[in-house]
From Swiss-Prot:
<dbReference type="GO" id="GO:0030430">
    <property type="term" value="C:host cell cytoplasm"/>
</dbReference>
<comment type="subunit">
    <text>Interacts with host TOP2A and TOP2B.</text>
</comment>
<keyword id="KW-0234">DNA repair</keyword>
<keyword id="KW-0227">DNA damage</keyword>
<dbReference type="InterPro" id="IPR000977">
    <property type="entry name" value="DNA_ligase_ATP-dep"/>
</dbReference>
<dbReference type="GO" id="GO:0003910">
    <property type="term" value="F:DNA ligase (ATP) activity"/>
</dbReference>
<feature type="binding site">
    <location>
        <position position="283"/>
    </location>
    <ligand>
        <name>ATP</name>
    </ligand>
</feature>
<dbReference type="GO" id="GO:0003677">
    <property type="term" value="F:DNA binding"/>
</dbReference>
<feature type="binding site">
    <location>
        <position position="236"/>
    </location>
    <ligand>
        <name>ATP</name>
    </ligand>
</feature>
<protein>
    <recommendedName>
        <fullName>DNA ligase</fullName>
        <ecNumber>6.5.1.1</ecNumber>
    </recommendedName>
</protein>
<dbReference type="InterPro" id="IPR050191">
    <property type="entry name" value="ATP-dep_DNA_ligase"/>
</dbReference>
<dbReference type="InterPro" id="IPR012310">
    <property type="entry name" value="DNA_ligase_ATP-dep_cent"/>
</dbReference>
<keyword id="KW-0235">DNA replication</keyword>
<comment type="similarity">
    <text>Belongs to the ATP-dependent DNA ligase family.</text>
</comment>
<feature type="active site" description="N6-AMP-lysine intermediate">
    <location>
        <position position="231"/>
    </location>
</feature>
<keyword id="KW-0479">Metal-binding</keyword>
<dbReference type="Pfam" id="PF04675">
    <property type="entry name" value="DNA_ligase_A_N"/>
</dbReference>
Amino acid sequence: MTSLREFRKLCCAIYHASGYKEKSKLIRDFITDRDDKYLIIKLLLPGLDDRIYNMNDKQIIKIYSIIFKQSQKDMLQDLGYGYIGDTISTFFKENTEIRPRNKSILTLEDVDSFLTTLSSITKESHQIKLLTDIASVCTCNDLKCVVMLIDKDLKIKAGPRYVLNAISPHAYDVFRKSNNLKEIIENESKQNLDSISVSVMTPINPMLAESCDSVNKAFKKFPSGMFAEVKYDGERVQVHKNNNEFAFFSRNMKPVLSYKVDYLKEYIPKAFKKATSIVLDSEIVLVDEHNVQLPFGSLGIHKKKEYKNSNMCLFVFDCLYFDGFDMTDIPLYKRRSFLKDVMVEIPNRIVFSELTNISNESQLTDVLDDALTRKLEGLVLKDINGVYEPGKRRWLKIKRDYLNEGSMADSADLVVLGAYYGKGAKGGIMAVFLMGCYDDESGKWKTVTKCSGHDDNTLRVLQDQLTMVKINKDPKKIPEWLVVNKIYIPDFVVEDPKQSQIWEISGAEFTSSKSHTANGISIRFPRFTRIREDKTWKESTHLNDLVNLTKS
């Protein structure tokens, strides 16, 4: 059984390793011949763990300030300079209530059992007792690691591809499809991995689209022809049905709020009368009585009440699994034909996505013009012979900004990193916001642009919604996670960028700026489009995504 100390040493070695091959080799060498291989891999990838601990950084600080009898204010201030694990370790070392162990005694099994128990409790008094118990058997470094596991970020600069391909060169691609870590560990040989497929009731990493700024580029990507599908302004939903059991997953593979999808349990059996088990890729949109789409955000429970004659409607665009058969390796035109055979539309409830078979540039231009005239979001272009590749950006998207001369072909989903005081009538409140993106390579957040222009009501709401730490443009108070040049040091920084809001930002064009730290990429005339409540920081535009957007 692997000890926590061994696991910590592995994490440290991975962090300091220089590249993908070296990191994967370290993991491969470590797990070879170990009986708890699955547990090691699972804990190396805490972000994939579906256990929910009901605790953010601020709550962890609050609880450990009580346990250690330390100043919560001092602990929060320390957190502003680094990471939660470092803060807890520092104050654990200084506290006089619980003496840290001199020698590590915990196994990974002990830690995993603790995390399972933590995920089952929600009362603060119970959390205090459990976190006290674990601290009493930890060294300072042990507790730091445990807290980082609770925070679901080990800071080892190694994501799923690095870790899973240590098992087998094909493991990461198989995981994208099956999303079943345990099955991959148990079938690690290539022959066995090839037998793993989509399974009903387990979410599949959704296939994605990259931006495209010209019709000509689309035909270079799909020379044999393409489908042009309406880009729906709703929420991506993956539907799973197994007999009378249903599951609905969002684009980040989390359960969808029940009020948005409960009605589907009545209509899916009617639309798919022959299906015992099925997995669908689709978009849920609020439509009026004429089946006209209502704006993004109208799916919210309060917003929906504003549209009295509206319905939730599922626009189905793909079938990934049907009665025991994995459909993902079948060409799209065959999947679509099969879908037409097995699905019966229910008006305003379950309908086919709007799809056009495109054979020339003139036809694509006409379809795009029509979509934009109807004030639709744009088009998604798909290879007619394409297989479904989970997690891969093999499709193309052309959004409404494409036709505006000199404008960005696509927006960027950036994270609010900080804020500045406004001027004049907006003096004394946060009115200008620092937007940025995550750099997977460095593990830091980089700045892209400043954004303003919100109306008074929106600004009033944002003062309460955004959790900020006031630093008064002091360079010494810039948190370790933020890379910002002196000219853009804000009055406030967010307490935790991973809990911050994600805003869709569009503008005239991507531009270069020596003052911004995201590889010098910025946005000319940035404008706020909407809050992306359907995304977490993981689905926001990362630095490598931003680089690709500027290239396209």
